[in-house]
Amino acid sequence: PDGSGRSSNRRDRPRQLSPSQSSDSQVHSGVQVEGRRGHSSSANRRAGSSSGSGVQGASAGGLAADASRRSGARQGQASAQGRAGSQGQAQGRVSSSADRQGRRGVSESRASDSEGHSDFSEGQAVGAHRQSGAGQRHEQRSSRGQHGSGYYYEQEHSEEESDSQHQHGHQHEQQRGHQHQHQHQHEHEQPESGHRQQQSSGRGHQGAHQEQGRDSARPRGSNQGHSSSRHQADSPRVSARSGSGGRGQSPDASGRSSNRRDRPRQPSPSQSSDSQVHSGVQVEAQRGQSSSANRRAGSSSGSGVQGAAASGQGGYESIFTAKHLDFNQSHSYYYY
């Protein structure tokens, strides 16, 4: 409740900032809101915003990127505070208020029709991802519920990876083309890594199951990962907020992931609002990627699908995913 309350405040604050900062960010956040509406997973929205701002950034160029960066920076700042996690979910929650504002942002995006329409087209294309991601999300949520503690471990990874993703967010765009290749590699490698992770640990099994599910879900993995991360991130966040004590399974894991979450995101925003654009997306991705594999593959592939739209986000992450998968294969899955 505190987390959600704070996230409500945070969500209100950043959004207030968003419209005040830019109707463009609102355009994209409006798209993201549309994504949120469509996604109900802020992660997908963010992925939507990422692919929106990725493709929109392709269309709107720096504008969507700037808006995403702004929102990403805001989110990334909040996420640096770990608020983005709450905020992302808060955004998920606020997606309604975000929808309101986002509708304003949508109207704004409509005001910027080219952007707005590209936003909508992206949001729609993302919406397809969202929808597929939503189905996958539900599947993965069920798997999540099954995997329970896997969330936390995965979230740790997600945090870590989201960190790498923040860092790599810059490179996502560069390697968007790579993403698909890597993404496929992930999918191939990741089941392997999933098995390896299974070998590595029961977490691995969980991660593996989720990841394998992710493999299928991976194109939607971002969506799944995001929604799962949301739930997972919600749990770890709450646990992080609650001291992750209730998460006795991995209070350290969730706490560390919270700390990591906070730490890397702080560097990420400091690194770049671009990484925040991606990290904002990736924050969403992180949230979504509570499974690092999902994040990596999820944001990679989900963003990969959306990142196929975003062209980028997951690309480097996909490389990372491959690398991580190699690490996972090395059983350094918890190499963080």
Curated annotation (Swiss-Prot):
Major subcellular location class: cytoplasm
One GO BP annotation of this record: epidermis development
The residue ranges flagged as biased composition, category Low complexity, are 16-26, 40-66, 73-98, 285-311
| Keywords from the named record | Developmental protein, Phosphoprotein
Q: Which family does it belong to?
A: Belongs to the S100-fused protein family.
Organism name: Mus musculus (Mouse)
Would you say which domain of life the source belongs to?
Eukaryota
- What is known about what this protein does? Aggregates keratin intermediate filaments and promotes disulfide-bond formation among the intermediate filaments during terminal differentiation of mammalian epidermis.
One cellular component term (GO) for this entry is: keratohyalin granule
Q: Where do the record's region annotations for Disordered lie?
A: 1-313
Q: Subcellular localization, per the record?
A: Cytoplasmic granule
The protein's name: Filaggrin
- Bias category Basic and acidic residues: which stretches? 100-120, 163-176, 184-195
Q: In which tissues is it expressed?
A: Expressed in the granular layer of the epidermis (at protein level). Expressed in the epidermis of the ear (at protein level).
PTM comment, free text:
Filaggrin is initially synthesized as a large, insoluble, highly phosphorylated precursor containing many tandem copies of 248 AA, which are not separated by large linker sequences. During terminal differentiation it is dephosphorylated and proteolytically cleaved.
Query: Which GO molecular function annotation, any one, does this entry have?
Result: keratin filament binding
